[in-house]
Amino acid sequence: MNTEKYSIFHVQGGLGKHVAATAVARCIKNNHPDRKLIVVCAWPEIFINIPFVDRVYQIGNTQYFYQNYIKDVDSLIFHQEPYLTTDHIHKRLPLIQTWCKMYGIEYNNEKPVLKFNNLQKKLAKDTWCVGDKPIMVIHTNGGMMTINAKPYAWARDMPEDIAQEIVDYYKKDYTIYQITKVNSPKLKGATHILSTQEKQITTMELK
């Protein structure tokens, strides 16, 4: 019988939400230091090098998870959605604080944490550090970032003409990268990082 105790933190959503979730993960660990922290998420690259995270699983790749962490095991489950809370919808609290309040854990100003290995550092240097100008990143199209995802959603995405105006205004002073879907409109004057280039995107914060 497994006598270990666990905190199981489930994160879904985009890259930015996962970065914010690292602060929530630290808060969970600080509130329950006697429990091993298990993370199930869409972007495992964000969590895999963090020292206070004991194990990382990608959503959909959780073989024997129930047997290892749920059945007859002392585990706490953190799997609610902060975007659907009253505090977040009414903008009463920042996302991280809303998240921690929803879980009933004490927030002590925990901040996001990112850890990169040497390969990721080299990839970041090769991708994001070209030229002398500071970089600017514009992400015009949200939602699912798969190859066959819808290219544009009028209720969520930035209109192409407005995005192009932003690039035209800043391109003299910044090296501009557009993170975009394979089939989404490409902005003139920007370097395009496709949504399928996950390794490059996850190293953006190094710049």
Task: Say what each PLM segment does.
Residues 1-207:
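Catalytic machinery of carbohydrate-active enzymes
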